[in-house]
């Protein structure tokens, strides 16, 4: 709802919209031109377990038991994304799956910190020029670094079969004085995604490409269905056009779809049992011409207002993702955009039950 509630045909509540079409025109164009997924849910709660879910289809027992103490400020560390070996998935991540199957792979910023891979399987398999997470660097700059590396590999016919690219500035920095506004951060992130689509669509490997875009976690944002519901996108030569898919999908289902395309086995019981995005694909490829849409919002706009939400933002740590209480941060973003008079909505927790059909007795 925070991003796509204004999409025609989707299950959205526009009263919860924060970053609509005027801020995220490229993501809206992707959802409109390809597939609108309005029933996608992340499997994770926060970034600490979210990146492990996104790359490995589960977070282990240690990580699931320790992130709550870390996030509540009661001790412990982040742990995820390879930060602590004990928190890594037992059989590794999707890159390990690729390695075992002889599938080429490369990472741009994911599980990379300070110019170093955080898991051994990514040594010599990541772009050293691509900046890892940090809100001082724009996502459009990250796109340019990816573009340069991609073009050099394409010229040598060495583009890996599996790639992960991280654009993370839609985390935003709240309303800290002198820093980009939430709108500016999200618009920058959206433009990077649009530029990525534009460049890939013009490349000779478009028909062989399938791109899946997801958030590692939903940041406990307001949603009228469930706080785990999250924006997700898929585009590529074989992806359907102008299609709305209400099928319930998940992080693990998206991973399973990638595995099926690459001929990989599932990594865990979760991706093995998840629903792949079958309905999103067509039988034949279709060319696509796209020009990235420059958001109407000023990408350079800075926070200038001194108020309660600015004071709360100044107390937060944005040096590392999810270093703050997600509910507190969600409240800051809500009131910074909606104003003080509209109450912050209570996070929605839904239960999804599929009743088994009873067979008639003879």
Predicted feature descriptions by range:
Residues 1-362:
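N-terminal pro-sequences and low-complexity stem/linker regions of secreted or lumenal proteins
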């Amino acid at each position: 709802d925070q991003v796509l509630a204004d999409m025609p045909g989707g299950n959205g509540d526009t009263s919860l919209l924060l970053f609509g079409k005027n801020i995220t025109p490229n993501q809206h164009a992707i959802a409109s031109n390809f597939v609108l997924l309005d029933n996608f849910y992340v499997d994770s709660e926060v970034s600490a377990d979210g990146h492990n879910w996104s790359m490995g289809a589960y977070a282990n027992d240690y990580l699931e038991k320790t992130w709550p103490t870390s996030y509540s400020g009661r001790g412990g560390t982040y742990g995820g994304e390879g930060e602590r070996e004990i928190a890594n998935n037992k059989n590794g991540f999707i890159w390990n799956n690729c390695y075992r199957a002889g599938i080429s792979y490369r990472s741009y910023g994911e599980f990379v910190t300070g110019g170093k891979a955080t898991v051994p399987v990514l040594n010599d398999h990541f772009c050293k020029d691509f900046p890892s997470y940090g809100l001082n660097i724009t996502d459009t700059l990250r796109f340019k670094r990816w573009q340069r590396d991609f073009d050099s590999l394409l010229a040598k016919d060495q583009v890996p079969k599996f790639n992960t690219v991280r654009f993370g500035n839609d985390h935003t920095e709240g309303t800290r004085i002198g820093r980009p506004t939430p709108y500016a951060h999200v618009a920058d992130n959206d433009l990077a995604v649009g530029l990525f689509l534009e460049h890939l669509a013009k490349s000779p490997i478009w028909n062989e490409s399938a791109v899946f875009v997801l958030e590692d976690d939903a940041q406990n944002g307001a949603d009228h269905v469930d706080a785990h519901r999250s924006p997700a996108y898929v585009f590529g030569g074989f992806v359907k056009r102008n299609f709305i898919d209400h099928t319930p999908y998940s992080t693990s289902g998206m991973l399973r779809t990638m595995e099926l395309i690459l001929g990989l086995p599932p990594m865990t019981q979760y991706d093995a049992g998840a629903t792949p995005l079958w309905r999103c694909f067509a039988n034949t490829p279709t060319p696509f011409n796209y020009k990235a849409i420059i958001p109407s919002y000023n990408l350079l706009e800075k926070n200038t207002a001194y108020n309660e939400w600015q004071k709360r933002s100044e107390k937060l740590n944005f040096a590392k993702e999810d270093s703050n209480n997600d509910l507190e941060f969600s409240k800051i973003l809500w009131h910074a955009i909606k104003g003080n008079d509209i109450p912050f909505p209570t996070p929605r927790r839904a239960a999804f039950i599929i009743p088994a059909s009873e067979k008639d007795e003879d």
